[in-house]
Amino acid sequence: MATQTVEDSSRPKPKRTGAGSLLKPLNSEYGKVAPGWGTTPFMGVAMALFAIFLSIILEIYNSSVLLDGILTN
């Protein structure tokens, strides 16, 4: 047989760290889904604002927005 059993006593225990202790409560919620829409509307607003920001940057880059007092080549 190709499988091998390992006794529990021979396995090293994971080392506890301060960061691990701080992050453990966050990991305990893994796999749980809040009922309803949750924070989806906030994500939609953030995505819309980011799209507006990118379009403004693109318009400035393409010089399709006139900027008074700023010289461009």
UniProtKB/Swiss-Prot annotation:
Residues modified to Phosphothreonine: T3, T5
Transmembrane segments: 41-61
Subcellular location(s) of the protein: Plastid, Chloroplast thylakoid membrane
Predominant cellular place of this UniProt entry's protein: plastid
Keywords: Chloroplast, Membrane, Phosphoprotein, Photosynthesis, Photosystem II, Plastid, Thylakoid, Transmembrane, Transmembrane helix
Modifications made to the protein after synthesis: Phosphorylated in both bundle sheath and mesophyll cells, phosphorylation increases when cells are grown under high rather than low light regimes (70 vs 900 umol photons/m-2/s). Double phosphorylation in bundle sheath cells is only seen when cells are grown under high light regimes. Phosphorylation is a light-dependent reaction catalyzed by a membrane-bound kinase; phosphorylation occurs on Thr residue(s) in the N-terminus of the protein.
Membrane topology: Single-pass membrane protein
GO terms, molecular function: phosphate ion binding
Pfam families in the cross-refs: PsbH
Top-rank taxon: Eukaryota
Chloroplast found in the keyword field: yes
GO cellular component terms, semicolon-separated: chloroplast thylakoid membrane; photosystem II
Classification via InterPro entries: PSII_PsbH, PSII_PsbH_sf
Subunit structure: PSII is composed of 1 copy each of membrane proteins PsbA, PsbB, PsbC, PsbD, PsbE, PsbF, PsbH, PsbI, PsbJ, PsbK, PsbL, PsbM, PsbT, PsbX, PsbY, PsbZ, Psb30/Ycf12, at least 3 peripheral proteins of the oxygen-evolving complex and a large number of cofactors. It forms dimeric complexes.
Similarity field: Belongs to the PsbH family.
Protein name as catalogued: Photosystem II reaction center protein H
